[in-house]
UniProtKB/Swiss-Prot annotation:
Entry's localization field: Mitochondrion inner membrane
Native source species: Heterololigo bleekeri
Example GO molecular function: ubiquinol-cytochrome-c reductase activity
PANTHER family: CYTOCHROME B
Residues noted as binding a ubiquinone in the record, renumbered to the chain: 202
GO BP terms in the entry: mitochondrial electron transport, ubiquinol to cytochrome c
Protein name: Cytochrome b
Top-rank taxon: Eukaryota
Pfam families per record: Cytochrom_B_C, Cytochrome_B
Length: 379
C-alpha cells in the first residue's frame, strides 16, 4: 500500500521521483555526498538562525548587547550561536568541495545546472556577508564599511548606490536593519534556487567519475545512496558539534569581542576566512575599479568553464595536464586565503599579485591543455 501511495499521491509522487526511485549512476564516489551535505547545512543554518532572530535586536544601541544576552541568558543560546557561526564555515567548506568536484569531473558541461550553482554560490556569499555585520563588533562594522564602500568604484552612480545600501552617509542603524532583513530573507531565496538546481540536475541526470553516459547502468537512489548520505550527515554533524563545543571561536575574529566604534579602526581589516581568497585578489590590484572587477571575476570565471570546454575531453580523471592544472588551482586558492589574512606589505602584496595572475591563468589555459592532450592521444 505504501509503495502504491508514494507512486500515486500527487505530492509523494514528486518526492518519490526525486529521492526514492531517482535513477542514479552506479559508480558515484564520496565526492558526490557534498550536495546533500549542503542541503543539511542550509537546514541547520535556517533553524539555528530562526531561533537566534527571536532574541536578536537590529538596533545599533542594542545589537552587541543582544548577542551577549543570547550567549549568557538564553537557554542554550551559546550553542545556537556557535552552531550558526561555525555552521557557516562548514557550509562554505562543503560548497568549495562541491565546486572543486564539479571542476575535476567536468560537471560544468551540464550548463544550466552549473550556472544556477554559481548563482547559488554568489547568493550564499551575499547571505554570509550581510550576516557578518549583525554582531556589531569592530571587525563586523569595519568589514561591512570597507566592502560596501567598494561599490563606489562603479562609474557615475557608485557613490549614490553606496548611500542607498547604507541608508545614510555611513554604516549605521538603517544599514544594520536592512542587513538583518536581507540575512533573514536570502536563505529562502536560496531554497528556491536549490529547487531549480535540483530540477535541472534531474532533467539531465547526474555526472559520474568516468564522465561518460551512465544511462545504461543506473540504480535507484534509495537505498543505495540514501544510507551513504545519512552516514555523511552523521559525520558532518558530529564534526560541527565537536568543533563548536571545543573550538567555538577558532574561525572568528578577536576584534568582534569589542563593540563597534566608528572612531577606532582595527589594525588589519579583513572579512571571514571563506572570503579571503577573493579579498586577496581585490587587494592585489592598485586600481579601486580594477580591484572590484577582479573580485567579481574571480568567481564569475566559473561561468565561463562550459565555454572553455573542448569536446572530447571531460574532466581531469584521465588528463595529466588538467590534473596538474586542477591542483595548481587548489594551491592558488589556499595560498590566496593565507595572503588575504596577511598585512598589505612586502612580500605578501607581491605574492598576492603573482597568485592572482595564476588564479585567472589556470582557467584560461584549460582549452589549450585539452587540445594538447587530444593531440598526444591522436599521435
Amino acid at each position: 500500500m505504501l509503495s502504491s501511495l508514494r507512486k500515486s499521491h500527487p505530492v509523494l509522487k514528486i518526492v518519490n521521483g526525486a529521492l526514492v526511485d531517482l535513477p542514479v549512476p552506479v559508480n558515484l564516489s564520496v565526492w558526490w555526498n557534498f550536495g546533500s551535505l549542503l542541503g543539511l547545512c542550509l537546514i541547520v543554518q535556517v533553524l539555528s538562525g530562526l531561533f537566534l532572530a527571536m532574541h536578536y535586536t537590529s538596533c545599533v544601541e542594542m545589537a552587541f548587547d543582544s548577542v551577549v544576552h543570547i550567549m549568557r541568558d538564553v537557554n542554550y543560546g551559546w550553542v545556537l550561536r556557535y552552531i550558526h557561526a561555525n555552521g557557516a564555515s562548514f557550509f562554505f567548506i562543503c560548497l568549495y568541495f562541491h565546486v572543486a568536484r564539479g571542476i575535476y569531473y567536468g560537471s560544468y558541461v551540464l550548463m544550466e545546472t552549473w550556472n544556477i550553482g554559481v548563482v547559488l554560490l554568489f547568493l550564499v556569499m551575499g547571505t554570509a556577508f550581510v550576516g557578518y555585520l549583525l554582531p556589531w563588533g569592530q571587525m563586523s562594522f569595519w568589514g561591512a564599511t570597507v566592502i560596501t564602500n567598494l561599490v563606489s568604484a562603479i562609474p557615475y552612480v557608485g557613490e549614490m548606490v553606496v548611500y542607498w545600501i547604507w541608508g545614510g552617509f555611513s554604516v549605521d542603524n538603517a544599514t544594520l536593519s536592512r542587513f538583518f532583513c536581507f540575512h533573514f530573507l536570502l536563505p529562502f531565496v536560496l531554497m528556491a534556487m536549490v529547487v531549480m538546481h535540483f530540477l535541472f540536475l534531474h532533467q539531465t541526470g547526474s555526472n559520474n567519475p568516468l564522465g561518460i553516459n551512465g544511462n545504461l547502468d543506473k540504480i535507484p537512489f534509495h537505498q543505495y545512496y540514501s544510507y551513504k548520505d545519512l552516514l555523511g550527515f552523521f559525520v558532518m554533524l558530529l564534526l560541527l558539534i565537536e568543533f563548536s563545543m571545543l573550538f567555538p571561536n577558532a574561525l572568528g575574529d578577536s576584534e568582534n569581542f569589542i563593540p563597534a566604534n566608528s572612531l577606532v579602526t582595527p589594525l588589519h581589516i579583513k572579512p571571514e576566512w571563506y572570503f579571503l581568497f577573493a579579498y586577496a585578489i581585490l587587494r592585489s590590484i592598485p586600481s579601486k575599479l580594477g580591484g572590484v572587477i577582479s573580485l567579481v571575476m574571480s568567481i564569475c570565471v566559473l561561468f565561463f568553464l562550459p565555454f572553455l570546454h573542448i569536446k572530447g575531453c571531460r574532466g581531469c580523471s584521465y588528463n595529466v595536464f588538467m590534473q596538474l592544472n586542477f591542483w595548481l588551482m587548489i594551491g592558488c586558492f589556499f595560498l590566496l586565503t593565507w595572503i588575504g589574512g596577511c598585512p598589505v606589505e612586502y612580500p605578501y602584496e607581491f605574492i598576492g599579485q603573482v597568485l592572482s595572475v595564476m588564479w585567472f591563468g589556470v582557467f584560461l589555459v584549460r582549452p589549450f591543455l585539452d587540445l594538447l592532450w587530444l593531440y598526444i592521444l591522436d599521435y
